[in-house]
Amino acid sequence: MNNVNGVIVGIDIQDKITQAAIWDEQTEMVIHVTGPENEAAFLNPFEVPGWGQSCNIEAACEFIASIIECASKCAQGRKAGLICITIADYEIKKLNFISEVMKRLQFNSEQWSVISHEESFAFYAYSQKKGLYSAGVMLLDYSNDDAILSLL
């Protein structure tokens, strides 16, 4: 992470909302990114199935650009150097769509990545002390409608 030119931005695209945070290397803290009106989450311009439909590409570009702009404001004007996007549906159509969005926003492929929610959770869980996960790790993903249990 020492070679990152700018702040590290995490963008979590969920069904109806998106949340974002930055990693501040100076304070070694995660800072939650708020929206233009200081809201805690960004309302998606379309639901998750829309990520991948070419008719939504311009709206997606504007949406991601606004999140990156808000992240820069939270970082006292420092620009995004590395962006990690997490998504629930890890499908090639959506990955290509996000790739096109990032290309249009003039981020090269070394400046961003996409991982699934499960990968993000596993990375977090397994980066903890081994004693915390040696007996196994359980991922509980829940919404208002249901809960999904996965053992890692």
Where does each model-flagged region fall?
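Nucleotide/phosphate-binding catalytic cleft detector across ATP-hydrolyzing
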Residues: 1-15, 19-20, 25-29, 51-138
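A generic structural signal for beta-strand entry/edge sites
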Residues: 17, 39-42, 146
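Short acidic-glycine loop/turn motifs at beta-strand connectors
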Residues: 22-27, 40-46, 152
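Short, compositionally biased "basic patch" segments
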Residues: 35-53
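Low-complexity, flexible helical/coil segments
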Residues: 44-49, 119-124, 148-151
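Short, surface-exposed, polar/charged, turn-prone segments marking secondary-structure boundaries
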Residues: 36-40, 111-114, 141-143
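Glycine-rich phosphate-binding loop of actin/hexokinase-like ATP-binding domains
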Residues: 32-34, 133-152
